[in-house]
């Protein structure tokens, strides 16, 4: 059962990592809203790297942010957290492939596989946590500007990339918990994987049984001889 759980957790974490990789370059982290605007000629959507605008004819123009130092602090922080999440996810994925008991990579014994799986699960949990913090931090700034009556700039709504990132982070955390929990549950010796010593029958009992059989046969022989 634990092998199935750790395998399920591994694939769940791999799916979460894939979704995090799709979330990072996605253009729709935030989308401009028509709330409070009488006439809207274009739609603006942004992510952590560039901003795009679509006019009424559907033509899009994108431009990169001019300088990293000119960006807001939360954008730089979200960049660092998302990149860290993906790196941790890749490390966890590699260690998980080596540590799974259904794989045979490098002829590693079960105790070392359990340690590798524990580290892989911890990496996936940290990756999901970094992604969750980055997405939530970005979303908080969007909602703060949106509900601020004194903010005179363009107001934005949550983009589809944020929902994808939340789902990816949750999958990474749950998958890491599944992988890590199997290592904790298997810390005690498993009877199914216990290596037992070969059975050796007692030589003393065998010798006594042999001597008893010989005495019985001798007794029968003696009676037949006198008859």
From Swiss-Prot:
Pfam families (UniProt xref): PMP22_Claudin
Reaction(s) catalysed (UniProt annotation): Na(+)(in) = Na(+)(out); K(+)(in) = K(+)(out); Cs(+)(in) = Cs(+)(out); Rb(+)(in) = Rb(+)(out)
Extracellular side: 25-74, 141-159
InterPro entries: Claudin, Claudin15, Claudin_CS, PMP22/EMP/MP20/Claudin
A Gene Ontology term for the protein's cellular component: tight junction
Highest taxon listed in the record's lineage: Eukaryota
TM segment ranges: 2-24, 75-99, 116-140, 160-182
Modified residues (Phosphoserine): 111, 211, 214, 217
Tissue expression profile of the protein: Detected in kidney, jejunum and colon (at protein level).
Record region (Important for the formation of tight-junction strand-like structures): 146-147
Site, Important for Na(+)-selective paracellular ion transport: residue positions: 55, 64
PROSITE patterns named among the record's database cross-references: CLAUDIN (PS01346)
Subcellular location: Cell junction, Tight junction; Cell membrane
Entry keywords, A to Z: Cell junction, Cell membrane, Disulfide bond, Ion transport, Lipoprotein, Membrane, Palmitate, Phosphoprotein, Tight junction, Transmembrane, Transmembrane helix, Transport
GO biological process per UniProt: bicellular tight junction assembly; cell adhesion; monoatomic ion transport; paracellular transport; regulation of intestinal D-glucose absorption; regulation of intestinal lipid absorption
Family: Belongs to the claudin family.
Function of the protein: Forms paracellular channels: polymerizes in tight junction strands with cation- and water-selective channels through the strands, conveying epithelial permeability in a process known as paracellular tight junction permeability. In intestinal epithelium, allows for sodium and water fluxes from the peritoneal side to the lumen of the intestine to regulate nutrient absorption and intestinal morphogenesis.
Protein name: Claudin-15
Organism encoding this protein: Rattus norvegicus (Rat)
